[in-house]
Amino acid sequence: MRLDGKTALITGSARGIGRAFAEAYVREGARVAIADINLEAARATAAEIGPAACAIALDVTDQASIDRCVAELLDRWGSIDILVNNAALFDLAPIVEITRESYDRLFAINVSGTLFMMQAVARAMIAGGRGGKIINMASQAGRRGEALVGVYCATKAAVISLTQSAGLNLIRHGINVNAIAPGVVDGEHWDGVDAKFADYENLPRGEKKRQVGAAVPFGRMGRAEDLTGMAIFLATPEADYIVAQTYNVDGGNWMS
């Protein structure tokens, strides 16, 4: 098992991609903290995964919550070897309809949350003297703008840039910082996304999802499980020489 004895903190992991990562890490021998703003859901997920998982409340927009989360896990495990910054928020609107509230909320979760989670965990990793792995969740939306998701695109571009800067800054401490950039990933959130696109683009419900999947060279939308291999690899010693990179895992979407 490639992560035997390691401890991992995954934000926003009560469901979706974060949960898939947690399950994969446990299969590889790690202990995993299911950190989520929805503590009840986190507890349910941890119970389903088994004794190698624990649940912890975390609001990445609240510095006190971040500090409590890290301190609690250090008390429980003694170290945090892997951080996955997965918590994120998606929204869409034309430029002329973007609200200050939505803008601030997306940047608070997607950018500030990523930065200050990196900071808190990196401090613990440096103090522990063992280095570690930090994996940020970027997106293809961070590589190119899209008409109705301008703010989300900007937040994910910021995550890519932060990954580069943090990677260069922290490698001297033995901390590798890299990112994964998924393309379109299917999941329960897509029902709401599809409905919003339908309203803005005057499409029947389900049509945007069909269009998006058909445009992927692989032939379908991604699934959370498609990303787990990269998430495992970047957490292993095999990735020690990889620094400040963002990896596309998108079924060829970026090249299409």
From Swiss-Prot:
- Enzyme class per UniProt: oxidoreductase
Q: Which CDD domains match?
A: SDH_SDR_c
- Ways its activity is controlled: Inhibited by DTT, N-bromosuccinimide and iodoacetic acid.
Say if the entry is tagged with keyword Transmembrane.
Answer: no
Question: Keywords in UniProt for this one?
Answer: Carbohydrate metabolism, NAD, Oxidoreductase
Binding residue positions for NAD(+): 15-17, 36, 59-60, 86, 152, 156, 182-187
User: Which Pfam families does the record match to this protein?
Assistant: adh_short_C2 (PF13561)
Q: What are the catalytic residues? A: 152
**Gene3D superfamilies with a match to the protein in the record:** NAD(P)-binding Rossmann-like Domain (3.40.50.720)
Q: Supply the EC number(s).
A: 1.1.1.-, 1.1.1.16, 1.1.1.14
Q: Which residues form a coiled coil?
A: none
Q: Does the keyword Oxidoreductase apply?
A: yes
Q: Any idea what job this protein has?
A: Catalyzes the oxidation of D-sorbitol (D-glucitol) to D-fructose. Can also catalyze the oxidation of galactitol to D-tagatose and the oxidation of L-iditol, with lower efficiency.
Q: How does it assemble?
A: Homodimer. May function as a tetramer in vivo.
* Name of this chain's protein: Sorbitol dehydrogenase
